[in-house]
Amino acid sequence: METVLVINPGSTSTKLALFANHDCLAEETLRHSVQELAPFENVVSQTSFRKQMIAEFLETHNIIQLAAVVGRGGLLKPIPGGTYLVDQQMLEDLRTERFNTHASNLGAILANEFAEKYHVPAFIVDPVVVDELQPLARISGLKGIQRRSVGHALNQKAVARKIAEDLGKTYEQSNFIVVHLGGGISLGAHQKGRMVDVVNGLDGEGPYTPERSGALPLVEFAQWILEQELTISQVKKLIAGNSGLKSYLGETDLRHIQAQIAAGDQTANYYLKGMCYQIAKSIGEMAVVLEGTIDAIILTGGAAYSQTVVQEISQKVTWIAPIKVYPGEMEMAALYEGVNRVLTGEEQALNYSEAKIEQE
């Protein structure tokens, strides 16, 4: 039995899983308190601390042999989607935080530690920096500024593969609009196995979300920034974490918001409907990218558990394509499946050092 260790580091947790033959043999989420992490100067310095806990997990499950180790991909250079072999250039970029710091940077670093111990390869799959934008999609409208591809690539691509399989097709044969509904919302136009355009909420595109602003009237927002004398870090925090439903209702949890609506709160109802309205508009935008040839519109992420949200969006876009709902996320399984496709020869592992994105 070829067992794969999956490592998914978060800011205050490390999710671990063991997979074989498409089955999850064991899964555990290790929680890290603020006090435990306080002594560490940065994310990378937590390597030994987390490594010890992972070693204990493997010992508990009597793991003496592995086929491979896979970690969540961190902040790297923009690269096409796929499964990448962890190499020295990747490790150097992560250890030096060349492209910024994030807990996910530990994914490849920790995967490499255990890959060396078990004498097996280490991989990452579809990191957040996946960039498959077609050249026209990079144009922003102002010389000197390019649009970026940032979104929930791992979950978007994994769910798209699952829905394609359900439809009797491969991901590479299909066209999908994938909508990841969470605290942040991202949309992707998936065309024959590539995410050729996105709605990047992190940079202030698209619909408002439980905590993000989405697209704002630029002149009014610029005036607001000047009047409030905001720094660039404050602007980023505002549009990516303190806007949307949080700014209108003081709440980001859709369960609480829906309870307010059930109790007769018309204001909550108004702004939740507004969010769904804007999401539907962005789905229409992605439909244009795919020129109307769409196998399905896929709604995924935590907010896809909300029947209210799903219904509000669906009734506006069912004329475009069939709606498929896949609530939650499947990151751990997606990491395993990416590696399994390489181990079985279905795909070839990609080389990070040689990876380049399509520009013009």
Curated annotation (Swiss-Prot):
Q: Which organism is it from?
A: Enterococcus faecalis (strain ATCC 700802 / V583)
**What is the name of the protein in this document?**
Probable butyrate kinase
Coarsely, its chief localization is cytoplasm
An example GO biological process term is:
acetate metabolic process
Which Pfam families does the annotation name?
A: Acetate_kinase
The Gene Ontology terms for molecular function here are: acetate kinase activity; ATP binding; butyrate kinase activity
Keywords of this entry: ATP-binding, Cytoplasm, Kinase, Nucleotide-binding, Transferase
Q: Which NCBIfam families match?
A: butyr_kinase, PRK03011.1-5
Q: Tell me the domain of life.
A: Bacteria
HAMAP family, per database record = Butyrate_kinase
Which Gene Ontology CC terms are recorded? Answer: cytoplasm
UniProt EC number: 2.7.2.7
Q: For this protein, what reaction is catalysed?
A: butanoate + ATP = butanoyl phosphate + ADP
Question: Which protein family is named in the record?
Answer: Belongs to the acetokinase family.
Q: Where is the protein localized?
A: Cytoplasm
